[in-house]
Amino acid sequence: MKLTCVLIITVLFLTASQLITADYSRGQRQYRAVRLGDEMRNFKGARDCGGQGEGCYTQPCCPGLRCRGGGTGGGSCQP
């Protein structure tokens, strides 16, 4: 009888903790490795174009930006 009560209480506790943690993780990715992969994909060095203020000597500027301020060191991407 005591064992049954302990098991029931344990199951209820585990169920409640699962429901509580499910609310906190809503809208987040399930696996950390997937989040890290997305962060690496969006990393500044992984882009094929230069963002605002970045040099445009070795790579083209991103859409909506133009390479300005030539000179010896190359220009920078500006709107």
Curated annotation (Swiss-Prot):
Which InterPro entries does the record cross-reference, listed alphabetically? Conotoxin
Q: Which UniProt keywords apply?
A: Disulfide bond, Knottin, Secreted, Signal, Toxin
Q: Would you say which domain of life the source belongs to?
A: Eukaryota
Which tissues show it? Expressed by the venom duct.
Please tell me whether the keyword Transferase is annotated for this protein: no
Q: Where in the cell is it found?
A: Secreted
Q: Name one GO cellular component term.
A: extracellular region
| Signal peptide positions on this chain | 1-22
Which Cys-Cys disulfides exist here? Answer: C49-C62, C56-C67, C61-C77
- Residues making up the propeptide: 23-47
The Swiss-Prot or TrEMBL record describes its family as follows: Belongs to the conotoxin O1 superfamily.
Record remark on domains = The presence of a 'disulfide through disulfide knot' structurally defines this protein as a knottin.
Protein name per its UniProtKB record: Conotoxin 8
- The scientific name of the source species is Conus vexillum
